[in-house]
Structure formats: C-alpha cells, structure tokens
C-alpha cells in the first residue's frame, strides 16, 4: 500500500459547512458566529504591544503570514477617529458569502477587533463597519475594508 504525506485539504468540507450554516442559521447568526471565531483565533495568535501603527501593521502581517491569510494595511483617520483596515487576499470558501468569495470576512472583524483592542491606548467600545472593494460586481473582491471606530456616546 502506498501512503502519501500530503496535508489534508479541507476546502470541500469548509464549502459544504458554509452552505449548511447559511441555510440552517441564516446570515446574521453566521456572521456573529464567525466574528466569535475570529476573536478566538486572535486570542491564540496575539501580536506584541506596539507603540505605532506602522509597528502594529508589521506585526499583524507577520501573524497573517503564519496562517497564509493575506496581508493588511492600517491607516489612522484622525477626523473620523477611526482606523481603516484594508485586508488583501482573504482566503475564500468557494463562492460562499455576499459578495461571492467573502464568507470569511466576519472572521476578520473579530480578529482585528481583538488584536486592536489589546493595544495600548485602544478603546474597548467600538463599532466595526465592513465594505468590500470590487471593480466588477460579478468578480470576487480583492480587498476587505474594515473601519474600527469608537462608539459614540448618547449622552452629550
């Protein structure tokens, strides 16, 4: 009997799992679940404390490289009191997600949320908005853009 030392490929399993989660639980529950998965991943793979955005970007790219999950560019938006996170090359689970190929994007929201709130000077009360950048609506976006910003207080 011949044995091969190939790494298992979970892509078929993940694609079928993504369809079942979407069908059984719905998009909102799926997104909440995947955000929690992202937070859990961030707890196991933490960057050191960083004093600058540039240093944090380098450390996050090193962590993303370890799991082959693309790379990130961080930008502070002073007027909006926000951080713009542009993630490139998110792994795809087939065509799952809206838009197609972005099923894992909520994982990034949880991952970056936990990574960023662990840094000096970060605030814990934040909201995340996500957008995807696609030149052609029929193509798979190459970027996932996340804005991390302080929650506005209702009391003024």
From Swiss-Prot:
Which residues are in coiled coils? Answer: none
Fetch the Pfam families from UniProt.
Answer: Cellsynth_D (PF03500)
Q: Sorted alphabetically, which keywords does the UniProt record give?
A: Cellulose biosynthesis
- Output the superkingdom of the source species: Bacteria
Q: Which GO terms describe its biological process?
A: cellulose biosynthetic process
- In what pathway does it function? Glycan metabolism; bacterial cellulose biosynthesis
Record has Transmembrane helix as a keyword: no
Q: What is the annotated role of this protein in its UniProt record?
A: May have a major role in the perfection of crystallization, involved either in the pore structure itself or in the organization of the pores within the linear array of terminal synthesizing complexes (TCs).
Q: What is this protein called?
A: Cellulose synthase operon protein D
Originating species: Komagataeibacter xylinus
The lineage is: Bacteria, Pseudomonadati, Pseudomonadota, Alphaproteobacteria, Acetobacterales
